[in-house]
């Protein structure tokens, strides 16, 4: 498997009924594969195509997975935005990466993300085609930016093609360095899928009765690869929105978790 669409198709056809548990719902790999193709259609209608950037300012939720798959289909680039980002960091991402759309939730923990977005320089937000709200709250109104819900994308007809190639740029992560601003690192689809398979094999994720706890944020490299390694194995996993020690400890017991990562 050398592309994200191939990875999702394999998981859906070989382990389609394997479950993904989130705080709000339970869904399957088969559901995810279809949702990714629906979201891809919705993003394509917004003008997202090969090489375009999609900002992910999200905790570990279902929409993160659907949007990742959609970017894979379109040959677009998923830009990981740390959930701790505030006005300065978000403005920096928009200036340097120029995402066509940004996906977000109205709050993460005790932080009101809508207030943060409203502080962003309007001229910068106007460079985004749309802001995609990925929770069930009322859609926000931001001057100079079109706002819509993730559910709007999910209601699209699924695409029946894929523009993603092995060497298509796929994801951007930021890393700390010697300068005040983060550095950006770009990975293609083949690099990501092959590494996830290597991690899957190393950790023996295909072992009988395997159950994974996604305790690390997907906006970081470790959490991101741990997620895709689970998908590569077609293994069921538990996906809390953010790490809370007591909650995750309970998940370890309730779901009989065999694989968990920390950092």
Features from the language model and the residues they span:
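Conserved AMP-binding A3 loop
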Residues: 28-30, 170-194
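A short helix-loop-beta submotif of the ANL/AMP-binding
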Residues: 52-53, 59-79, 83-87, 96-101, ...
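Structural core segment of the AMP-binding/adenylate-forming
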Residues: 73-148
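Conserved AMP-binding/adenylation subdomain of ANL enzymes
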Residues: 193-211, 219-262
């Amino acid at each position: 498997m050398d592309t994200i669409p191939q990875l999702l198709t394999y998981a859906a056809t070989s382990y389609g009924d394997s479950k993904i548990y989130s705080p709000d719902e339970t869904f399957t790999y088969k559901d995810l594969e279809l949702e990714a193709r629906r979201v891809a259609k919705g993003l394509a209608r917004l003008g997202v195509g090969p090489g375009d950037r999609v900002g992910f300012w999200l905790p570990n939720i279902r929409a993160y997975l659907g949007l990742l798959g959609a970017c894979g289909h379109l040959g677009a680039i998923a830009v990981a935005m740390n959930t701790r980002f505030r006005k300065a960091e978000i403005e920096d991402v928009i200036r340097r990466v120029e995402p066509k759309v940004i996906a977000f939730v109205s709050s993460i923990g005790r932080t009101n993300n809508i207030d943060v977005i409203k502080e962003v320089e309007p001229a910068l937000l106007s460079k985004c085609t749309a802001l995609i709200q990925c929770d069930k709250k009322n859609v926000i109104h931001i001057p100079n930016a079109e706002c819509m819900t993730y559910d709007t994308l999910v209601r699209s007809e699924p695409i029946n093609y894929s523009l993603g190639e092995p060497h298509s740029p796929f994801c951007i992560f930021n890393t700390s360095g010697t300068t005040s601003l983060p550095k950006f690192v770009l990975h293609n689809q083949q690099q990501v899928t092959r590494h996830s398979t290597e991690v899957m094999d190393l950790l023996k994720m295909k072992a009988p009765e395997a159950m994974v706890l996604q305790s690390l944020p997907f906006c970081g490299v470790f959490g991101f690869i741990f997620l895709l390694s689970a998908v590569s194995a077609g293994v069921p996993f538990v996906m809390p929105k953010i790490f809370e020690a007591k909650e995750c400890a309970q998940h370890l017991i309730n779901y009989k978790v065999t694989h968990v990562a920390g950092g």
